[in-house]
Amino acid sequence: MAKLQAITLSGIGKNGDVTLNLNPRGVNPTNGVAALSEAGAVPALEKRVTISVSQPSRNRKNYKVQVKIQNPTSCTASGTCDPSVTRSAYADVTFSFTQYSTDEERALVRTELKALLADPMLIDAIDNLNPAY
């Protein structure tokens, strides 16, 4: 298992000119969910990423890797800001692998998702909320 450490996401945003620094916030000892967030004065307004890996159980035979992104927004279009969340954007990605999957198969799924998210059809669907036809 990798040690929880700071992550820098660069080249993000619509124009690719945003950098986000995520700092480790700890691992929940009960469920093993690792949390990272942007340093901020108001915790509710911090951008947050959580990562968890669930082991197979008697009833569930697959490993489950979940990555969740939460981006709260505190300002209105007019630029008026207050210390409360006006809305949040979320992403929830779940990967499922059998215990017999190889690291090559898992890497293929991860890189396929990366390439898929760079495709113009998905960019239009996510950024502009336009469905495929």
From Swiss-Prot:
Main localisation: virion
Name this protein carries in UniProt: Capsid protein
Assembly information from the UniProt record: Homodimer. The capsid protein dimer binds to the viral RNA via an operator hairpin, but also many other RNA sequences in the viral genome.
Gene Ontology biological process: regulation of translation
InterPro entries: Levivir_coat, Phage_RNA-type_capsid
GO annotations of cellular component type: T=3 icosahedral viral capsid
Family: Belongs to the Leviviricetes capsid protein family.
Localization of this protein: Virion
RNA-binding, annotated site positions: 90
